[in-house]
Amino acid sequence: MVRTDGHTLSEKRNYQVTNSMFGASRKKFVEGVDSDYHDENMYYSQSSMFPHRSEKDMLASPSTSGQLSQFGASLYGQQSALGLPMRGMSNNTPQLNRSLSQGTQLPSHVTPTTGVPTMSLHTPPSPSRGILPMNPRNMMNHSQVGQGIGIPSRTNSMSSSGLGSPNRSSPSIICMPKQQPSRQPFTVNSMSGFGMNRNQAFGMNNSLSSNIFNGTDGSENVTGLDLSDFPALADRNRREGSGNPTPLINPLAGRAPYVGMVTKPANEQSQDFSIHNEDFPALPGSSYKDPTSSNDDSKSNLNTSGKTTSSTDGPKFPGDKSSTTQNNNQQKKGIQVLPDGRVTNIPQGMVTDQFGMIGLLTFIRAAETDPGMVHLALGSDLTTLGLNLNSPENLYPKFASPWASSPCRPQDIDFHVPSEYLTNIHIRDKLAAIKLGRYGEDLLFYLYYMNGGDVLQLLAAVELFNRDWRYHKEERVWITRAPGMEPTMKTNTYERGTYYFFDCLNWRKVAKEFHLEYDKLEERPHLPSTFNYNPAQQAF
């Protein structure tokens, strides 16, 4: 940048537009010296951009080629050197030329064909670190200028906008000020200093924003709201805008725009937001096929008959006739139960008798018409049987089954004996009575402990009582006096002596000194006088 060490701070702030914005220092630029933006003179003050100082008309430059050209003529004027047609904001060219030429008073030897003058742009370190070539081919169209005026280029490449540095973080044409509190940001109002009123500058700002977000070359006239607030509608303006029939070549063409580049592939960038193609997964009943999809998509269609079916009429809804017919055809592929009870469409390999699924299905369908078969097919609801379901006791003493009027007997619960084997009816009166007196004590104890709750246990207890064995209710054992030993003490209520206890766990008799109270002994079991035990008689 141009050093003005001899001037005061107020004079520095009153430099002309070109002297504040584009100050020339070709030596630093040609030698490739990098700068990290430490020089504050490269930043301009927006409030003092355009005041005119007649005594500061001419600016000394290190080289004659570093003189600034007429800004309006080179950027917005008749670009005859490039051979490119006028476009965009050409109607504002005289005003731009007039306002800029009055404020700059450039030397006469600088012509529009000279191109964009050499400007000392402070760029970050680039891989090449070389000399930036400046020639007429680096002339910019007005849309590229718009990308450089305070708006970061989408490609961040100065070479694509006319002044280029291959570094992505290079600044644009007009250097933007740093984010400092004392600096004023570049706004739309400052654009009026270039010969445009505020409305024209606002329209230009919108068009520049549209170019940046849409990736176009500025060939359409877009006005209204800033598209950065509506990124989802960015692609729609490509079709709705009125384009120039002969647009200039856009250096950003072919690049994917930032808006929607993550969620949309490159081949769908020109499509509007619509659902004419199924953007959402279809319902199971839909067999719609996207014409842009490959033929392999037909493999994912559900088809029970083994044939691939597709429809180009769109998805079918349940109310359509075709879908109803298709559903009926699919239902006929399963097992069908006719009203007369016959079963058709039985798959191969399925059991067809009454013991398989076909028999169960037939039985259930028959139970729907015959209420008497509900208990056989589906079972009974226990809450309707009048039983106490919270009782921990067994149900069989009181409830046999829903069809039985009396409880089951114990011998009829565990198993069922065919009538051919029930011979006790014929021989019950011919069998001799059992005489337990013939058996020893060991067998009697076996009958007592192994036939709990049976009459045989009661008969064995009677026989043991007859043999001077007594059952102690507290000790729950059988005791008897030791043979040949009298009690050492005997009263009307108790006695003391040596007794034999029968140990059922070790199956033996154990002698023990014991104080016996008579009221704790079990009485003799009571049996009918005419009772003559015969196990065969207890079969029924």
Curated annotation (Swiss-Prot):
Gene3D superfamilies: CCR4-NOT complex subunit 2/3/5, C-terminal domain (2.30.30.1020). Residues 437-540 are annotated as: Repressor domain. It is found in: Cytoplasm; Nucleus. GO terms for biological process: negative regulation of intracellular estrogen receptor signaling pathway; negative regulation of transcription by RNA polymerase II; nuclear-transcribed mRNA poly(A) tail shortening; positive regulation of cytoplasmic mRNA processing body assembly; regulation of stem cell population maintenance; regulation of transcription by RNA polymerase II; regulation of translation; regulatory ncRNA-mediated gene silencing. Ubiquitous. Highly expressed in brain, heart, thymus, spleen, kidney, liver, small intestine, placenta, lung and peripheral blood leukocytes. The keyword Phosphoprotein applies. Residues 96-126, 276-342 are annotated as: Disordered. The modification Phosphothreonine is found at T93. It comes from the Eukaryota. InterPro entries: CCR4-NOT_su2/3/5_C_sf, Not2/3/5, NOT2/3/5_C. It holds the Pfam family NOT2_3_5_C. Keywords: Cytoplasm, Developmental protein, Disease variant, Intellectual disability, Nucleus, Phosphoprotein, Repressor, RNA-mediated gene silencing, Transcription, Transcription regulation, Translation regulation. The keyword Chloroplast does not apply. GO terms for molecular function: transcription coregulator activity; transcription corepressor binding. Coiled coil: none annotated. Residues 96-123, 289-313, 321-333 have a biased composition (Polar residues). GO terms for cellular component: CCR4-NOT complex; CCR4-NOT core complex; cytoplasm; cytosol; membrane; nucleoplasm; nucleus; P-body. The modification Phosphoserine is found at S126, S157, S165, S169, S242, S274. It is linked to Intellectual developmental disorder with nasal speech, dysmorphic facies, and variable skeletal anomalies: An autosomal dominant disorder characterized by delayed development, speech delay with nasal speech, and characteristic facial features including upslanted palpebral fissures, anteverted nares, a thin upper lip, and micrognathia. Some patients may have skeletal anomalies, such as brachydactyly, toe syndactyly and flat feet. Belongs to the CNOT2/3/5 family. Component of the CCR4-NOT complex; distinct complexes seem to exist that differ in the participation of probably mutually exclusive catalytic subunits. In the complex interacts directly with CNOT3. Interacts with NCOR1, NCOR2. HDAC3 and GPS2. Component of the CCR4-NOT complex which is one of the major cellular mRNA deadenylases and is linked to various cellular processes including bulk mRNA degradation, miRNA-mediated repression, translational repression during translational initiation and general transcription regulation. Additional complex functions may be a consequence of its influence on mRNA expression. Required for the CCR4-NOT complex structural integrity. This is CCR4-NOT transcription complex subunit 2.
